């Protein structure tokens, strides 16, 4: 892959490798083959020999061809005779039956075709031959020559055929043909050796060789790609790309498994050896190094399946091949290719094989460790999958080297670690998606999948045991409200989904769980386990599993699983009989329904009798059910007893429970419901108002809930009349409680669009209840496409529906999830309208600035969307808004402005719909004064003329401006113009001059102006106010503010020409004008209309709307109807000018379920808060929160997340810098009853006293330690019961709180508290970083020896910093850089041992995950910070590398920096300039004078055989089992009395107890005291080593002639050589994985600047 073999090296001596001894020592094999002039001369001589041999071979071929031609001529004559006989027979038949001319023609054509085919078969390829030329043989190809090889060929025949193929290749003229032929020959040979190997293996396992020959051969086809088809890895696809067409044969005796002769057996072995020898002798000729390694390793692994007598012979040949391949490493191909294949291999028990593979295996493991995140890489998934960073595509925590997840081998420590993680996810109430994301990143191997499934199964067993011990012997009856039932219910849902997706081995679960014991030592006897298993029996795979165990039935038992399940039944007399009956009956009845065997049914009856099953108890439930389901119930089961009974019925008889609930939802109540309407008259529907109890919905089986959703959708969309509000709320809550996609059931109906009422009901439910579900399911893109299709297909005539869709788009656009940016197809054509497009751009800016977007390529389509929006309506955001945009969006707007030749400093509305000038409006008013003064009493013809005149965009934009000027100049009052504008905007005026059209039934007349046009008119009108009236009208601005506010209120609330949302959005889009805040203040906070609507909330108890949310208010619909009946703002109306009666603009008034004018105002409130911060307007900020805090708390879906994002986005705003106490106003938007539990005690004390000294006096370190420690404890993997203290209120888990996960909630509260602190960023940054500074090297040892931070604390800090705003980032990065510099400087005297090393043949992991060195947790902290931080902050990693660069003096220090950078490198994208920049920074460090000299001197010392000249290699310390920081892995240090604490190596005064504790908790270095002293005084200072090596005093311990020093220096050189090797491997690796040509060019340019010895390691990089 890396190597382009020169032409002069393609012909290699055939016998170059034949003289390698089979028993040669592995350590002597790896000497490189030098490139010398002698070798080139030999190659030229051998080329001449090949030519002579080829000429001889051609002469022999010509003789053979002549003989074949003679034989073919004889065969042709025989065939011609046969053909003549056939023709004579056909003529006789034709004479007997006459034929038509068509049949004669067909017969002649068939005869000609047969003759052509015969000629082609006799002489194919005879081009240019005359008619009398005898037929010639077909030209030979590689395939035709290779076909001569079959399973009956001898070894010598195989060798001759392969050499003949090779000679044929040399006869080709084109280099391209030669290359193709070489690849073909290698593929044929590789595949055929696999075929022979599999044949030998098959014969060896089914036959016994004897001395009696009994063979008879027949040619039968056989697949030659047997082994390669079953193999894994990338090489298998390469080798198996072309299969051999050779036909092979086996004897009948072989197929029957009878004895065969030893001669035949040996012939097959020699045939295989000949092919392997040919491949070995032509390694350089083919240049297929990676494929050759794969062949050898794969066959070595399979050789263990052969009989013992022949294993040695096969292994020897393969081992010689493998040694020959590895002898060319770094000569003909880079070591990186060997690393990739070795990493995928399984180990062999042979010591020779281990000695050969181990260096490469360990080297591959070291590179894999470098590319992976440090230490707790997997625990980051626990937080990363759940916290609100929205990392939808995480960095690979596993082995990037082999492009596969970690190999789950027999190492139980590693498996238990991942099992613990899954258990932790289950405890967080996580769905199966984070679990799949954790363990299934591109898994292809079925074996690996089974191991992962086993790990998940162990996690479910662990979770089951946790619940069993937490709630021992819980009864099923009367516990429906207890936390135990809710936790079991939640886990049963998770367990069901895992089983449904095939992620749990149920058989393993049952068998293993039956072997477990409770904490008190008793066996498991709990009916909850039986109920847990019973729920999964409806899954098809589970049905199949139990059916397999129901086949063999006898009098005692059937199968082994069912008795194990029944062993969990608790039929103790002290246990309630009803509880055991429920679980037992539930399980056995479901088993019974899956079988038709009468013996099994009888056996189930017998089992029930054995358990003293009491059918009378169920008869009692049955009687209750029969009586209840015929009753007419105003409400559906409200008492706890009835809910418990119904839950039992739904689990035992699910169909009847479903049907009864659906029947009740559809028409279960005779109560009449009147929706809001016009004039107090609205649509009347019969149904129920309140939803059913949450307990009923939660206790339904999953099957019932899914069925209920499907049936509800059908009733919702296909019903002619509107559905009841209780039914719709039941549907929404069921969707919340049932994980799964929503869009397939709802949005497919939008395409029909023939019933407006159900579509409006869906829009209402999605806007207020299901939007969060769609976002979590990543279905928001589907929703936006569906809504856009509705709007683009045809104008929506129902303006009420159109405005509801506008509100849904607004709400979706201001809270985009990060996954929507990945939906690339949507951005190229997305258009949500004038106002919503601008909201989308603002939301994108927040996402880029706040969230940890994966890489720069993810936002590549966003500029396309911005460009399209700018073209359709060129709008520039104000300077105050652009100030907070990320740089990438600022540059986009600057570029678009330059393309339109606009001034980038001009922050006015640049819309193409320019407002009319004031002079033009006044002129139009003068001309139409007499007409408009009549108002709505105009004649029909006059109204029609006006409508036609104002239908065009320009004139329609002019109309509203004219009306405002009339009112402003007091010429025509609004009560005259209002009704006329209503009729012109909302109705087509039809006169009486067309009576013939009225005789036919007509559809409602289309609107004169659509809602989209009204939005544009609103925007133009606001522009007219700011750009024309405020500039050119002589009226004072104070009076203008009041007139504008009055006109807007009348247009919105009295005449409903405009909508409140569109007017506010248009005003907020003009934040560049200084009068906008004043108008907004007057309009929002001084107008009586809005104040009256806000006062509605005071009619209820003062704490009602604060104590709960509309999402869990069963009486919400009643309150909402009361509001809409009092303030009918959502139904567009017109006023009849004659009767002055308000009428609807449309025949159909759509039912309103959730909306009102104030609830739809909540997204606008968030925008106003943001604008007030941008404009540094504290008065507007305070007024907005004080006026709207109650409805905001009641209606808003995600308060905590929204407040947190706002504080982060605007953290460095002038408003909060000058008035930091204003941030505390956000607390008014939260639930006041939860504040004490939400924040820390110190912060709560500060809120009560308002004295900041309550926090500062405590100290930043103590304050943040108290704040973050609870989160670190929750993230600790070692505590599986960490969530036991939390009460799972399941009915609130999905719908009633913003964040359902307790870990998410805790993290969010910590972030919120830090952001609300009225303290500067430096104080916060220093306090947080101080939690990492557990040592001060300037103090004595006794003052420095403090326990290091836990890994979960470091992880929590890194994630908290990544979420906190950029201002804090700018404060803490210099601190962390300085601390890392100090540790790197100190590390010159520490052990540069590689971290997380792997033992050969297995993985070792730091399971306890203890960190004892400061540099450990700084690596860990910085890695995860840059993994999660927002995209723009990622570039600061370049600055960190630049600042650290001057301190890099040795290889170990560079390796530490590389450990930080390499796992995060993928976040820079695969084809970006940022990737080139960070890589350039890292590689140029290697060219610095000090480090390059250090590397060069180290390589020279290695060449001088420092390691090899040591007398006793056993005395040299084995560094494989040490990690990076001097910790020994996998060794028992109980016998070592030395304290290895890094703080003080010479400490002898420590207490023995402390030393014992240190030994128990942490792994320690296995150095002696003297070794430590010398090691620490010399390591890392190469000049010091060179100085010591020049000493001539033999008694000097630093003399290079001192044996002890030589051994120590050998250790250091070996460690440095390992680090240098890993750095080399990393450079090869990044060159492989980033196919970006500018990147590769820059990499090669820098590599060429390396010094000679180091540069020689990259000969194969090109």
UniProtKB/Swiss-Prot annotation:
Pfam families: Med23 (PF11573). InterPro entries: Mediator_Med23. Residues 95-124 have a biased composition (Low complexity). One of its GO terms (cellular component) is transcription regulator complex. One of its GO terms (biological process) is sorocarp development. It comes from the Eukaryota. Residues 39-122 form a coiled coil. Residues 1-24, 95-139, 206-252, 1530-1572 are annotated as: Disordered. It is found in: Nucleus. Keywords: Activator, Coiled coil, Nucleus, Transcription, Transcription regulation. Residues 1532-1560 have a biased composition (Acidic residues). Component of the Mediator complex. Belongs to the Mediator complex subunit 23 family. Component of the Mediator complex, a coactivator involved in the regulated transcription of nearly all RNA polymerase II-dependent genes. Mediator functions as a bridge to convey information from gene-specific regulatory proteins to the basal RNA polymerase II transcription machinery. Mediator is recruited to promoters by direct interactions with regulatory proteins and serves as a scaffold for the assembly of a functional preinitiation complex with RNA polymerase II and the general transcription factors. This is Putative mediator of RNA polymerase II transcription subunit 23. It comes from Dictyostelium discoideum (Social amoeba).
